[in-house]
Regions:
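Short acidic/glycine- and proline-prone juxtamembrane loop motifs at membrane-interface regions
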Residues: 170-179, 358
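Membrane-interface alpha helices of multi-pass inner-membrane proteins
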Residues: 155, 205-226, 346-349
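Transmembrane-lumen/periplasm boundary regions of multi-pass, lipid-linked membrane glycan transferases
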Residues: 233-331, 355, 402-411
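Membrane-interface transmembrane helices that cradle and orient dolichyl/undecaprenyl
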Residues: 144, 187-212, 222, 331, ...
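Transmembrane-helix motifs of polytopic, lipid-linked glycan transferases
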Residues: 118, 122-146, 186, 322-327
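Transmembrane-helix signature of polytopic, membrane-embedded enzymes
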Residues: 111-118, 139-162, 182
Length: 412
């Protein structure tokens, strides 16, 4: 039997990546602590916990599953500002989003009272801290497999010191998009990984059952957390068919099986209530693009400005990476092209949906841009200008980390 704890699995690269993720976790915990000050109240956070708790208690049925119960001691701000229309069904999220958000509250009973705001904030942030760590680990794994150790480190450092990623993982004045982002990222790259294994001389379904389950979980997490991420479903199929041109039937079968399992898991988030599931689909907004937004220059400026706020390092790194990609033929291969295409699609959807879910699409694009930038940087490190490139990359990463830590200190 091959031992699990081998040097290949747990060596220096894994140790360094783990240290970076610990630094990421420390920053997130700092932000969670600052956001949990007594007297502060995030109405949307209370709403998510309240509605999720009602779903857990009612098992997805009854009036409490759709309409939140008023919090004692608080005004009905949730009803006026956040209560979804369409008979109580959320147009953008399935019950899975609320169930995940309130899972810690289900495991550790804390009353939804004003005096428990600090404890409730820590509980609300716990699932998304985990998603933030998982997305970072997945990002490092994918970038390292595609571009080597250098690409993995560059992508992970950009991720760990990204203000937008930190805010979303710590729920610091940000929507909880970590689960949707991890699901979308996992769906795309798991589909790519599955396609690469189709040429192995083994039975398709049995050999790929682990990846099929992972693809199913990624799809249900993405679409269940944000309905408009249904776009990753056909996108995953497109990558699979492109990468396995002589095994397209097998790729399609795997995709169908993964979608069927994901649909079953999605149905389970409604506690197998067919009527609730059907009404959720009927009242869901799966695209909702505002076509006139594409003719408004302000929409483009807004997306670019928010992208720079999510990761200031991208303001410098992304233009350089794009110029290199389009001017250097060697850089235009699938490993660089795939994350760029996905990021461009998400940013285009963000422009067409200026409010929500546009903000979610912008957040989803950031990890894919990190992979793209890391790939171009790794390619440049293999040229005869390695020393200059290395100095520029290190300078950018150190400056990005220092600026982010300075901004964190200012939060105090």
């Amino acid at each position: 039997m091959v031992p699990f704890f081998t040097r290949e699995r747990f060596g220096r690269p894994q140790f360094l990546a783990g240290c970076l993720l610990l630094a990421f976790l420390a920053q997130c915990l700092w932000l969670v602590g600052k956001g949990a000050r007594p007297g502060t109240l995030d109405v949307s956070e209370i709403y998510r916990l309240e509605r999720g708790a009602a779903l857990w208690q009612g098992r997805g049925s009854g009036p409490d599953a759709n309409v939140p119960v008023p919090v004692p001691g608080l005004k009905n701000e949730t009803d006026s500002a956040l209560a979804p229309e369409n008979g109580g069904y959320d147009a953008h999220h399935s019950p899975l989003w609320y169930l995940i958000a309130s899972a810690p509250l289900h495991l550790r009973q804390v009353a939804l009272q004003p005096e428990n705001i600090r404890s409730l904030h820590w509980l609300a942030g716990a699932p998304f801290l985990i998603f933030g760590l998982l997305l970072g680990a997945s990002l490092w794994y994918v970038a390292r497999r595609l571009f080597g150790n250098a690409g993995g480190y560059i992508a992970l450092v950009l991720y760990c010191f990204s203000p937008g990623i930190l805010r979303a993982s710590a729920l610091f004045s940000a929507e909880p998009e970590g689960g949707a982002a991890w699901g979308a990222f996992g769906a795309i790259f798991t589909a790519i990984a599955v396609a690469h294994t189709l040429y192995a001389p083994r039975e398709v379904i049995l050999w790929n059952w682990r990846r099929i389950l992972l693809l199913s979980l990624s799809l249900v997490l993405a679409v269940g957390s944000q309905f408009s991420l249904v776009v990753v479903v056909p996108l995953a199929l497109a990558f699979m068919l492109y990468l396995a041109p002589t095994r397209r039937i097998a790729a399609f079968v795997i995709w169908i099986v993964a979608c069927a399992i994901a649909l079953l898991l999605w149905y389970a988030s409604y506690f197998f209530h067919a009527r609730a599931f059907w009404q959720g689909m009927v009242h869901g907004s799966f695209l909702g693009i505002s076509w006139p937004a594409y003719t408004m220059p302000g929409a483009y400026h807004q997306v670019l400005a928010q992208l720079g706020q999510a990761s200031p390092a991208l303001v410098v790194a992304l233009p350089v990476a794009l110029i290199t990609y389009f001017s250097w033929r060697r850089a235009r291969y699938f490993g660089n092209t795939a994350p760029l295409l996905v990021a461009v699609l998400f940013l285009a959807l963000a422009i067409g949906t200026p409010h929500y879910p546009g903000l979610g699409f912008q957040f989803m694009a950031v990890p894919f841009l990190f992979v793209f930038v890391a790939g171009i940087a790794a390619d440049l490190l293999e040229t005869r200008h390695r020393q200059i490139t290395l100095a520029a990359i290190l300078g950018l990463l150190v400056a990005s980390a220092a600026w982010n830590l300075w901004e964190l200190a200012r939060v105090a």
